[in-house]
Regions:
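C-terminal accessory/regulatory regions appended to core domains
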Residues: 1-167
Length: 167
């Protein structure tokens, strides 16, 4: 049973976060190890394993990047944990320039404007990956995921800069 089936959801990039959360809470309640405290050793072990599976699946599905990676895995393209380098020099140059721009920011307004710019870039790549998945262009979707990881890391660096500068 895959993660989507576990939560009773279709295998799609776009999903209802509220429904995912509700299903997660329901499955947690249903398979919580405390509910099996008087059960056999085997059933207690199975409930612990099921609870761990539910937690793992939820973590994968709630994060858009890991959700895309999982959809790719289900379709035979596994890029999790790979160390393949991006082959897009323009994108890599843009990332270097963005990081240099971030390093030079000292004012709150400039940081918020920069954050807005990076969020727009992130949303555009999310839209691209969604379109590529819908068109079954799996290798292109995988390349977008690689780019999204760079952008997600930059978003994290923005949060760190915000804490450092204005924290």
């Amino acid at each position: 049973m895959n993660h989507f089936e576990l939560f009773g959801l279709p295998i799609e990039f776009e999903l209802d976060g509220g429904l995912l959360s509700n299903q997660f809470r329901e499955l947690q309640r249903q398979f919580h190890p405390d509910n099996f405290s008087t059960a056999s050793e085997r059933d207690r072990l199975m409930s612990v394993q099921k609870a761990a599976q539910i937690n793992d699946a939820y973590q994968v599905l709630k994060n858009p990047i890991s959700r895309v990676e999982y959809i790719l895995v289900l379709n035979g393209v596994d890029i999790r944990g790979e160390h393949k380098t991006l082959q897009d020099p323009l994108f890599l140059m843009e990332q270097m320039e963005l990081r240099e721009e971030l390093e030079d920011i000292t004012a709150e307004d400039a940081l918020y404007d920069f954050d807005d710019k990076v969020n727009k870039l992130y949303k555009q790549h999310m839209l691209d990956v969604q379109n590529e998945l819908q068109a079954s262009q799996l290798e292109q979707a995988a390349e977008q995921v690689r780019k999204l990881k760079f952008i997600a890391k930059l978003k994290h660096e923005i949060e760190q800069a915000e804490d450092r500068l204005f924290g």
